[in-house]
Curated annotation (Swiss-Prot):
<dbReference type="InterPro" id="IPR022867">
    <property type="entry name" value="MsrP"/>
</dbReference>
<dbReference type="GO" id="GO:0043546">
    <property type="term" value="F:molybdopterin cofactor binding"/>
</dbReference>
<feature type="binding site">
    <location>
        <position position="238"/>
    </location>
    <ligand>
        <name>Mo-molybdopterin</name>
    </ligand>
</feature>
<keyword id="KW-0574">Periplasm</keyword>
<comment type="subunit">
    <text>Heterodimer of a catalytic subunit (MsrP) and a heme-binding subunit (MsrQ).</text>
</comment>
<dbReference type="GO" id="GO:0030091">
    <property type="term" value="P:protein repair"/>
</dbReference>
<keyword id="KW-0560">Oxidoreductase</keyword>
<dbReference type="GO" id="GO:0016672">
    <property type="term" value="F:oxidoreductase activity, acting on a sulfur group of donors, quinone or similar compound as acceptor"/>
</dbReference>
<keyword id="KW-0500">Molybdenum</keyword>
<feature type="binding site">
    <location>
        <position position="146"/>
    </location>
    <ligand>
        <name>Mo-molybdopterin</name>
    </ligand>
</feature>
<dbReference type="Pfam" id="PF00174">
    <property type="entry name" value="Oxidored_molyb"/>
</dbReference>
<feature type="binding site">
    <location>
        <begin position="91"/>
        <end position="92"/>
    </location>
    <ligand>
        <name>Mo-molybdopterin</name>
    </ligand>
</feature>
<keyword id="KW-0479">Metal-binding</keyword>
<keyword id="KW-0732">Signal</keyword>
<dbReference type="InterPro" id="IPR006311">
    <property type="entry name" value="TAT_signal"/>
</dbReference>
<feature type="binding site">
    <location>
        <begin position="249"/>
        <end position="251"/>
    </location>
    <ligand>
        <name>Mo-molybdopterin</name>
    </ligand>
</feature>
<comment type="function">
    <text>Part of the MsrPQ system that repairs oxidized periplasmic proteins containing methionine sulfoxide residues (Met-O), using respiratory chain electrons. Thus protects these proteins from oxidative-stress damage caused by reactive species of oxygen and chlorine generated by the host defense mechanisms. MsrPQ is essential for the maintenance of envelope integrity under bleach stress, rescuing a wide series of structurally unrelated periplasmic proteins from methionine oxidation, including the primary periplasmic chaperone SurA and the lipoprotein Pal.</text>
</comment>
Length: 334
């Protein structure tokens, strides 16, 4: 795997930044916050995050054993851990960036069951311990780009999805992979209340083409900053597809199903003109209500240090993934 030329270790989103808000912006859902433009709301959240000293501390997750393959290390500046764990989108726990950190402690992640089914020869069921022990774990420093035009650099820990799928032996009929988040309204207030959860239909679902799922970059993620994922970041296991917008990174996964047909995805169902199935990071294809040409990188500095930078095609991973979409109109298939 070629070392990513766009990432330097100094670019990684610091540990304190990675972990917190995204408001509901879909006019079709009839939620009052939907009138807000996502970038404006997201930047307001950035201001509230940086202006005070009341940021929640980075959670103390269980330390993990993992390797650091050279191919996945780089010199990008990391987003601090407290920002990674305190500034994020997980509508099942509320719309504000700080809501997941404040409310996700109610999520019970052990015991846990992850089922792999559908067009496979050998259906599998993994428990909580399997997620960190069945496959060798490795740290990968990835860029993360939100559709709201902000970004981070994060040292995720996990294993390639293709290793898990290989155990299940996809059949020749398998063309897509469908993912589903846990449905637990008693633990997730956004699944109980339409207003709290942004008017989305739950459980949250996502999907990839099989070749995307099998790509070496696609990561089943169980940790960050050397420790197990905190609940607000999608514990105990989430998906990271670094060349796609962050909403493709489904959290707290309980089901992976291989299918013949393209599966439904939550944001595409909610607003098909705004959120496509592919959701590849593309500076040349704007969201209908804001530009995707630039992004705000969340690093270790304060609000005055947050700078706009050019958005990279496929989030800087074009050398690795552009061939997946050869001949595909990226404007039509956004």
């Amino acid at each position: 795997m070629k070392k990513n030329q766009f990432l330097k270790e100094s670019d990684v989103t610091a540990e304190s930044v990675f972990f917190m808000k995204r408001r509901q912006v879909l006019k079709a859902l009839g939620i009052s916050a939907a009138a807000l433009s996502l970038p404006h709301a997201a930047h307001a959240d950035l201001l509230s995050w940086f202006k005070g000293n009341d940021r929640p501390p980075a959670p103390a997750g269980k330390p993990l054993e993992f390797s650091k393959p050279a191919a996945w290390q780089n010199d990008l500046p990391l987003t601090p851990a407290d920002k990674v764990s305190g500034y994020n989108n997980f509508y099942e726990f509320g719309l504000d960036k700080a809501d997941p950190a404040a409310n996700a402690g109610s999520l019970k992640t052990d015991p846990w069951t992850l089922k792999i089914s559908g067009e496979v020869a050998k259906p599998l069921t993994l428990d909580h311990d399997d997620l960190t022990r069945r496959f060798p774990l490795e740290e990968r420093i990835y860029r993360m780009r939100c559709v709201e035009a902000w970004s981070m650099v994060v040292p995720w820990i996990g294993f390639p999805l293709h290793k898990l799928l290989a155990l299940a032996e996809p059949t020749s009929n398998a063309k897509y992979v469908a993912f589903e988040t846990i449905y637990a309204p008693e633990q997730m207030p956004g699944q109980q209340d339409r207003f709290i959860g942004g008017g989305l239909k739950y459980p949250y679902v996502e999907g990839l083409r099989l070749d995307e799922a099998m790509h070496p970059l696609t990561l089943m993620t169980v940790g960050v900053y050397g420790k197990a994922l905190p609940p607000q970041n999608g514990a105990p296991v989430r998906l990271i597809v670094p060349w796609k917008y962050g909403f493709k990174g489904i959290k707290s996964i309980v089901s992976i199903k291989l299918t013949r047909e393209c599966p439904p995805t939550t944001w595409n169902l909610a607003a098909p003109d705004e959120y496509g199935f592919y959701a590849n990071v593309n500076p040349h294809v704007d969201h209908p209500r804001w530009s995707q040409a630039t992004e705000r990188f969340i690093g270790s500095g304060g609000i005055l240090d947050v700078q706009r930078q050019p958005t990279l095609l496929f989030n800087g991973y074009a050398d690795q993934v552009a061939s997946l979409y050869r001949g595909l109109d990226l404007r039509e298939n956004f």
